[in-house]
Every structure is written in C-alpha cells, then in structure tokens.
Amino acid sequence: VSTLLPVVAAEEPA
C-alpha cells in the first residue's frame, strides 16, 4: 500500500 501514497501525493500538489 506504500506505493499508493506517493501516487496520490503526486496527483494533488501540496
């Protein structure tokens, strides 16, 4: 599930 975290963060900028 750790792979989904960076993906979501990259989609929504800060």
From Swiss-Prot:
This is Unknown protein from spot 245 of 2D-PAGE of etiolated coleoptile. On the 2D-gel the determined pI of this unknown protein is: 4.8, its MW is: 35.7 kDa. It comes from the Eukaryota. It comes from Zea mays (Maize). The lineage of its organism: Eukaryota, Viridiplantae, Streptophyta, Embryophyta, Tracheophyta.
